[in-house]
């Protein structure tokens, strides 16, 4: 099973909560956290199978647009291990899910 990282950046905390709720309800993904980036921008981050993360971010975008402003939506399929080493977003570097 391929792993992916999905992010939705919105303006405002309520929009982020709405997006996060929709993402975890829409597909089998794990909400691994959120990041406040300043200026009212907040990013929700999910992990899971590539197809599930794509479906989740699409659902999250639709939900967040109903209550706020979506700034960006992005999915990184199979992020390189160095991404986890530099930005430990819910994974321990070197961790193999199939083990």
Curated annotation (Swiss-Prot):
It is found in: Bacterial microcompartment. Disruption phenotype: Absolutely required for BMC formation; when deleted from an artificial operon (Hoch_5815, Hoch_5812, Hoch_3341, Hoch_5816, Hoch_4425, Hoch_4426, Hoch_5814) being expressed in E.coli, no BMC shells are made. The keyword Aminoacyl-tRNA synthetase does not apply. Pfam families: BMC. It comes from the Bacteria. Artificial BMCs can be made in E.coli by expressing (Hoch_5815, Hoch_5812, Hoch_3341, Hoch_5816, Hoch_4425, Hoch_4426, Hoch_5814) or (BMC-H (Hoch_5815), BMC-P (Hoch_5814), and 3 BMC-T (Hoch_5812, Hoch_5816, Hoch_3341)). Cargo proteins can be targeted to this BMC. Artificial BMCs can be made by duplicating this gene with a 16 residue linker between the copies (making an artificial BMC-T). The shell assembles into balls with holes where the pentameric subunit would be, and can be used as a model to study assembly and permeability. SMART domains: BMC (SM00877). Coiled coil: none annotated. Keywords: Bacterial microcompartment. GO terms for cellular component: bacterial microcompartment. The only hexameric shell protein in this bacterium, it forms the majority of the bacterial microcompartment (BMC) shell. Expression of 5 proteins in E.coli (BMC-H (Hoch_5815), BMC-P (Hoch_5814), and 3 BMC-T (Hoch_5812, Hoch_5816, Hoch_3341)) forms a 40 nm artificial BMC with a molecular mass of 6.5 MDa. There are 60 BMC-H hexamers per BMC. The shell facets are 20-30 Angstroms thick (a single hexamer layer), with 1 of BMC-T trimers protruding to the exterior. Belongs to the bacterial microcompartments protein family. This is Bacterial microcompartment protein homohexamer. It comes from Haliangium ochraceum (strain DSM 14365 / JCM 11303 / SMP-2).
């Amino acid at each position: 099973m391929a792993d992916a990282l999905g992010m939705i950046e919105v303006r405002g905390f309520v929009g982020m909560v709405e997006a996060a709720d929709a993402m975890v309800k829409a597909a089998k993904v794990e909400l691994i956290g959120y990041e406040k980036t300043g200026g009212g921008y907040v990013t929700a981050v999910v992990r899971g199978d590539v197809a599930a993360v794509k479906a989740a971010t699409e659902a999250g975008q639709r939900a967040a647009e109903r209550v706020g402003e979506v700034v960006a939506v992005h999915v990184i399929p199979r992020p390189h291990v160095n991404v986890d080493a530099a930005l430990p977003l819910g994974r321990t570097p070197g961790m193999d899910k199939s083990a």
